[in-house]
Amino acid sequence: MWCRKKFFKYWRVLVPALLLAGLCRPGPGPAAETGGGGSVTVPEEPPLVALTFDDGPRTSTTSRLLDGLALREIQATFFLVGDRIQGQEVLVRRMAEDGHQIGVHSYDHSCISDLSRGDFDLQVGRTRGVLSAVLGSGDFWLRPPYGIIDNAGLRWAGSPVVLWSVDPEDWKDQDTGRVVGSVLSHVEDGSIILLHDIYDSSVDAALQIADALSGQGYCFVTVEQLLQAKGIQPQDGTVYRCAK
């Protein structure tokens, strides 16, 4: 079966190289003319979507989710709570080794709006420190708990701030079928989907969503990859809800 992940990888490498070499140019159809009068068929880019998960890690559910994503060759983005990382270092390292993007979701899931700079750093900077101790230095993007951040927080963020465009509120009733239906009815190219990897129902929903959208031709990427693929240069302190 065609691997959409590999299609995306090679499409991003092949097409710019051909354009740079003058061997193909954009055209109205799938075939672009070459300098020799022939043509090179350039496949259309598939629709892209980013699955994101908050509030973990949690041993049982996050492990099962990682297993399911690996089986499907899917990358996702995990926003971790700092005080839940201790004792889960092996799980967090596995996330990184599997190619997932890892970000910050505060230290203890407190709202990070209306904080002093010192308290903000205890929530965000402290969590980055925990992640760096486990993974080494890295760009750990921020997702504020409850999606709430004030202007001061944006100035202090030290990274892009990631929200979402599709929220099935999976925490409310933990109804897998409803969550899947909600996501499938709202998703589109460039969507950022919010789920939580601490519920068994959400893990079930995520894998069903992955299968359904893969069947529709979607390709799953991290948030950073999504913005890059859409030509968006992420900026520190800027909020991103989708890639359009």
List where the protein language model places each region.
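Solvent-exposed loop/turn segments at secondary-structure junctions
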Residues: 55-59, 83-86, 102, 108-112, ...
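Active-site beta->alpha N-cap acidic-glycine motif
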Residues: 33-126, 130, 137-138
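Sec-dependent N-terminal signal peptides of Gram-positive bacterial secreted proteins and lipoproteins
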Residues: 6-29
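Structural recognition of the beta-strand scaffold that forms the well-ordered cores
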Residues: 49-52, 76-80, 101-104, 140-143, ...
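Alpha-helical scaffold elements lining the catalytic groove of polysaccharide deacetylases
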Residues: 61-64, 110-137, 148-189, 202-205
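C-terminal domain-boundary segment and adjacent tail
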Residues: 36-44, 71-73, 85-86, 201-244
